[in-house]
Amino acid sequence: MINVNEFRPGITFEFENEIYVVISAQHSKQGRGQANVKTKVKNLRTGAITIKTFSGGERVEKAHIEKISMSFLYNDGESIVLMDDSTYEQVAIENTKITWELNFLTEGIKVKLRKFNNEILDIELPAKIELKITSTFDAVRGNTTTNPTKRATLETGYEIDVPLFIKEGESVIVSTEDGKYVSRG
């Protein structure tokens, strides 16, 4: 059992027959009332992100998640295929379980497969990833009022805002948490 006051990003727990990972947790106390813990959590079975509020001191069951290092091989349209780096065993995961992660998967990338009681839940990406810009337009001179950006398409098809100095064919570092530009690659 784990006390909800100990919630930090990355902690996994069971609640109402579902498995969640904490994305963020905010502790608040109002006057003489009991403290509350407002958490943003991701359901590891469905991929849905929700906000749950717990009473301070409430206890939930800790979920012991097994993480296996895998390499992404390919996407066949309905599922992705990963290969275990040590046993060379291949595993398929439905695309519906990993819709967000699909935006950042390139051939050969190392990911962590999350399993709970031999049930495949989802994959965990590195915090930042390097991707190539496949298309963007040239900067327009004079368009530099406040923090100017332009749209760019990555090699995976995902679109992000990048600074004006980034050109087509360059690599950029992207955060997999929020899908935003971090720096040049």
From Swiss-Prot:
GO terms for cellular component: cytoplasm. Pathway: Protein biosynthesis; polypeptide chain elongation. InterPro entries: Elong-fact-P_C, NA-bd_OB-fold, Rib_uL2_dom2, Transl_elong_fac_P/YeiP, Transl_elong_KOW-like, Transl_elong_P/YeiP_cen, Transl_elong_P/YeiP_CS, Transl_elongation_fac_P. Keywords: Cytoplasm, Elongation factor, Protein biosynthesis. The keyword Transport does not apply. The keyword ATP-binding does not apply. Gene3D superfamilies: 2.30.30.30, Nucleic acid-binding proteins. Pfam families: EFP (PF01132), EFP_N (PF08207), Elong-fact-P_C (PF09285). Its main location: cytoplasm. GO terms for molecular function: translation elongation factor activity. It is found in: Cytoplasm. GO terms for biological process: peptide biosynthetic process. Involved in peptide bond synthesis. Stimulates efficient translation and peptide-bond synthesis on native or reconstituted 70S ribosomes in vitro. Probably functions indirectly by altering the affinity of the ribosome for aminoacyl-tRNA, thus increasing their reactivity as acceptors for peptidyl transferase. HAMAP family: EF_P. Belongs to the elongation factor P family. This is Elongation factor P.
